[in-house]
UniProtKB/Swiss-Prot annotation:
Family of the protein in this entry: Belongs to the CNKSR family.
Domain DUF1170 residue range list: 325-546
Record protein name field: Connector enhancer of kinase suppressor of ras 3
Positions of modified residues (Phosphoserine): 381, 383
Sequence ranges assigned to domain SAM in this UniProt record: 7-72
Location of the region described as Disordered in the Swiss-Prot/TrEMBL record: 308-333, 348-391, 518-538
Origin species: Rattus norvegicus (Rat)
Positions of the CRIC domain: 80-174
Pfam families: CNK2_3_dom (PF06663), CRIC_ras_sig (PF10534), PDZ (PF00595), SAM_1 (PF00536)
Free-text note regarding domains: The PDZ domain is required for interaction with ENaC and SGK1, but not for interaction with NEDDL4 and RAF1.
Gene this chain is encoded by: Cnksr3
Biased composition (Low complexity): 311-329
Keywords recorded for this protein, A-Z: Cell membrane, Cytoplasm, Membrane, Phosphoprotein
Amino acid sequence: MEPVTKWSPKQVVDWTRGLDDCLQPYVHKFEREKIDGEQLLKISHQDLEELGVTRIGHQELVLEAVDLLCALNYGLETDNMKNLVLKLRASSHNLQNYISSRRKSPAYDGNTSRKPPNEFLTSVVELIGAAKALLAWLDRAPFTGITDLSVTKNKIIQLCLDLTTAVQKDCLVAEMEDKVLNVVKVLNGICDKMMHSTTDPVMSQCACLEEVHLPNVRPGEGLGMYIKSTYDGLHVITGTTENSPADRSQKIHAGDEVIQVNRQTVVGWQLKNLVKKLRENPTGVVLLLKKRPTGSFSFTPAPLKNLRWKPPLVQTSPPPTTTQSPESTMDASLKKEKPAILDLYIPPPPAVPYSPRDENVSFSYRGHTKSKQPLPGRKGSESPNSFLDQESQRRRFTITDSDQLPGYSVGTNILPIKMRGKTPSYGKPRPLSMPADGNWMGIVDPFAKPRGHGRKGEDALCRYFSNERITPIIEESASPVYRFSRPLTERHLVRGADYIRGSRCYINSDLHSSATIPFQEEGPKKKSASSSAKASSGEPSLLVSWLTRLKLLTH
């Protein structure tokens, strides 16, 4: 590879054409000034201002790409794992010494000032830069396969985050320096541990460049490489596809960095411009790769399986049933290749409990209708959760009762039931003379004889029953002779028919307002009950109504 310092102005212009899209308007300015490779590596913010690159963000993009070229040109033969650890150790030690010497100065104002000096911030930036260079090595193969180095990498990342957070926090400079010192001490310990505990020769080996030719690429086949680009413009190969040109070459491995494509340096380029350069020559590609040292690790290519799904083979005849031992079954399963269907990602089931979708589903149960829209049939394209929606609608009609309820039926054209209008006294507060509890009635004995109704009793009832022309509550059974003994806990429940609500119920005589439990009736029974209600809903005398209520309460 030709050194960057030997580049001609044309090579510099060709390199700038692959940078970020926002930098393309400045390409002709580089061409007009005829900047060569040596001038490019020494370019600064002031030089970019003179070129017309006035925006700070655009200047930073150019300088980041130039930094990658400097690392490639000057650090290729010197950078290794050991040197990078030593650089990080030196940067952290320098920052620690700067803080200590500054605190010894008589002019130290860290306890009153909130603005750190520029030298302090510069040392922090240098420390983070050294850490990034080391992390770039730890994040590649073969170091990613070592557990200890992976843990160390995560610790360094966390310490760098703590360092940047401490510097950007609005606090006294002394507090900021205390936090930075804590981070620096931990970094020094990590560097010392890496230097003394690691004896593998891979720590001292440098990276190398290797040229790879991929000829005879068939149209539409592709190269079979998976490339990941970092935020600053490094392009790293993460794997290859089986039986692809990249895989057949046996020279492209996971962790290799793409430096040139067809003799054009692509460091710092956008990924889309790199892909365009790879497709420039359809017959073949020449790659220049930067390879990390392998050392004593078993470093082999990392092929990736084709992600296209292949359907499993259909069995025409059932396999013969033979008894096999667990050992033979395990060996056979290891020898067989895993079917492609097992590679598919199956999403997990919905969270429990399942919440049904709001759909207008009509169910008819013994004459009661919830909605008018019919239930849609199960289709092949629906998800399995659609059946759960139907089941959740069915569970709403489960009634806890001694009677066995038959199955439901789906209704399509069912007339809605006309609901009874509200009485004028609906929502009014109870009379002031009505006590809050039912203790005024005393304990009702179901085996006691009915009391006679005199004028005094009628006056007592007049205080508690309003004269609102409400249909009376008629007993279900007219013969009070046959009485069945109930448990003590059920003695205060009297079974009757509440025609105000339109259904049979259990009435608690100890309460001033009856709490009802809906009890669904048969169709014919309900029709007969409604007809009898119409017959008895004439206008009975007030005395009959009182007597009926009193007779019900005495049970």
